[in-house]
């Protein structure tokens, strides 16, 4: 009887050890910079995207959750918007922020679009991109800084999706932000260089490229 109990105990131990040694693959569902944001709002790795049959619209470049900000991160639109002006006339307060540390591009873009005293050609162009609740907008200086920090990560993915890579050299690398210049809000706003990370204050009636971004929402 004792020997039978010993054999049973040994068999149970062997089963438990085998279970411990078994490897179970758990799918990695974490969204990371370089993942692809699709038109339906899902974010996929490139391998998943290739198998999905979905349409890509942007590449994820930031996934940090920050207090006081909406959404679950940011994705950069695959394509540039043709050069357009911040405003079609000077001397008008458009209600956008001059805080270069604020992640407020979405609010700024709406303020530009909603101003009645002057039009914002770049804001109007960005509003035309809105699809399925994934609302594109003009990034603030702070959001462009986040994009600049990972531009070499997202550029290869943008290219593979048929988009426009962010310029990394000193030529044709300037983009409008939605942040105005403090103390000169009615006349100037900031350009941002994806080649160097530099900023340049610029009259708002000048036409420059825009690279919209999207807030990811679950």
Predicted regions and their residues:
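Secreted/extracellular small peptides and ectodomain modules produced from precursors
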Residues: 15-18, 36, 159
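A generic structural signal for short, non-catalytic loop/turn and secondary-structure boundary residues
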Residues: 10, 69, 168-171, 185, ...
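Short hydrophobic beta-strand that contains or immediately precedes a catalytic carboxylate
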Residues: 76, 138-139
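Secondary-structure transition/turn motif
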Residues: 78-81, 192-196
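Short, compositionally biased
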Residues: 20-132, 204-218
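Sec-dependent bacterial lipoprotein signal peptides
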Residues: 1-18
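Active-site rim elements
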Residues: 195-203
């Amino acid at each position: 009887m004792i020997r039978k109990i010993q054999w049973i105990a040994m068999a149970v131990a062997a089963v438990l050890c085998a279970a411990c040694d078994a490897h179970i693959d758990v799918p990695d569902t974490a969204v990371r910079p370089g993942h692809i944001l699709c038109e339906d709002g899902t974010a996929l790795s490139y391998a998943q995207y290739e198998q999905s049959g979905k349409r890509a619209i942007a590449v994820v470049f930031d996934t940090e959750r920050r207090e006081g900000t909406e959404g679950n991160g940011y994705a950069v639109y695959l394509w540039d918007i043709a050069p357009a002006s911040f405003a079609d006339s000077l001397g008008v307060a458009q209600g956008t922020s001059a805080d270069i540390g604020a992640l407020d591009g979405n609010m700024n873009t709406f303020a530009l679009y909603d101003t009645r005293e002057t039009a914002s050609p770049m804001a109007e162009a960005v509003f035309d991109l809105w699809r399925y609740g994934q609302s594109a907008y003009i990034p603030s200086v702070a959001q462009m800084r986040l994009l600049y920090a990972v531009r070499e990560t997202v550029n290869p993915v943008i290219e593979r999706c048929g988009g426009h890579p962010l310029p990394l050299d000193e030529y044709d690398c300037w983009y409008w932000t939605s942040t105005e210049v403090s103390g000169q809000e009615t006349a100037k706003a900031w350009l941002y260089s994806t080649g160097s990370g530099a900023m340049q204050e610029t009259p708002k009636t000048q036409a420059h490229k825009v690279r919209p971004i999207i807030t990811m929402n679950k």
